[in-house]
């Protein structure tokens, strides 16, 4: 099958080699574990973290005479994902046997979908940026297909000095293999694609996206070429399990291939592994072609068929997806594309923001959520679900600023108190005497005192109005940050006789 390159070469994404510029071509095959209580063809549990071989049915262990029974929930989840990817849903698909031998594959074959997948072509829009002008570039990455398949078990090599063991808990767990077109041209684009795909499946509730648990992992296909030429020979980097590692693997592999080609060599089509400790890829085996797996329709499973009404019913139940929420945040709340993009990265963050923003200024709330809340969560290595500051508490802090009860600086201190100690914001302000000083006469006395003690700076400020900020800072310091900043600023300018 001929692959059509739909993207125009862009010099800002070229990689400089010794003999000229190169372009990296990237496609990805992402294995996403479906959220379901039981496996694709058996009733065994899919719960993560159990003792080895505790969630294994006779079907998973490939005992003779045991026939697979398709889990309908897994079918629904695959269709939901396809709809979320704006993809064509195939009303008829076929399960095939993919034949290969591996110790953690008891059947000697994997049940997958080869010729007739459940989901056809779709697309994902990724945003790259911001650039030096604060602008984002939106790039469409095509989805080739999505098909259902079984996961294999897990080989364990660290349990005994001379023997390996097999854990079949994962054997038979339902996977969606989501295959992109080779539309990505940089490590940043690949990372953005993986991030966006993970966000979509999490919003849909079809995969938890926990890469550290292996429930989402990527096979990354990398090749290089001279700009405008035909695609080069690709290498596949298997089972990359973090977004950061995806970027590192691509950057190393592209440089490796460029070095070989510039030295007059040729690229072997092969499967490689990424060594995270060394930051490099290494050869695993020669890359198999489809005929090596001897695909044929599974005789134990009928073709999977459903009608359009089944698809329409699932489409009607889909949640609002990140791209739609982002547009709404920009259009209805006046947020920048950058802020909106951050707020929709996780459904829980978007929900938190919306709760706080209800009846309040969206830009102000976005600033607090992004800079203060997410900053504190990142510092403490917590998830949004673990935040000690509830939407109601943050909303109260913002209300206190708007009412003029506290200043922005006091609000930051109040946020810290609630983060570490909890409590009602209004009650804390009352009990700790945190209200800002709004008495003009009291503020004026503080301004007069500072100016009287710094007559030299007064003279300088009259010549250089920018120095007025020094007086504002001193007044705020003297009043413990409680003076109303706007009132202080106005009085300082009035006393100095500047506009």
UniProtKB/Swiss-Prot annotation:
Disulphide bridges, residue numbers: none
Cross-referenced PROSITE patterns: GATB
Pfam families referenced in this protein's UniProt entry, alphabetically: GatB_N, GatB_Yqey
Annotated catalysed reactions: L-glutamyl-tRNA(Gln) + L-glutamine + ATP + H2O = L-glutaminyl-tRNA(Gln) + L-glutamate + ADP + phosphate + H(+); L-aspartyl-tRNA(Asn) + L-glutamine + ATP + H2O = L-asparaginyl-tRNA(Asn) + L-glutamate + ADP + phosphate + 2 H(+)
InterPro entries named in the record: Asn/Gln-tRNA_amidoTrfase_suB/E, Asn/Gln-tRNA_Trfase_suB/E_cat, Asn/Gln_amidotransferase, Asn/Gln_tRNA_amidoTrase-B-like, GatB, GatB_C_1, GatB_Yqey_C_2, Gln-tRNA_amidoTrfase_suB_CS
An annotated GO BP: translation
EC number: 6.3.5.-
Keywords: ATP-binding, Ligase, Nucleotide-binding, Protein biosynthesis
Molecular-function GO term, any one: glutaminyl-tRNA synthase (glutamine-hydrolyzing) activity
Entry's family note: Belongs to the GatB/GatE family. GatB subfamily.
Subunit structure: Heterotrimer of A, B and C subunits.
Alphabetical list of NCBIfam families matching this protein: gatB, PRK05477.1-2, PRK05477.1-4, PRK05477.1-5
Function: Allows the formation of correctly charged Asn-tRNA(Asn) or Gln-tRNA(Gln) through the transamidation of misacylated Asp-tRNA(Asn) or Glu-tRNA(Gln) in organisms which lack either or both of asparaginyl-tRNA or glutaminyl-tRNA synthetases. The reaction takes place in the presence of glutamine and ATP through an activated phospho-Asp-tRNA(Asn) or phospho-Glu-tRNA(Gln).
Protein name: Aspartyl/glutamyl-tRNA(Asn/Gln) amidotransferase subunit B
Organism: Bartonella henselae (strain ATCC 49882 / DSM 28221 / CCUG 30454 / Houston 1) (Rochalimaea henselae)
Gene behind this protein: gatB
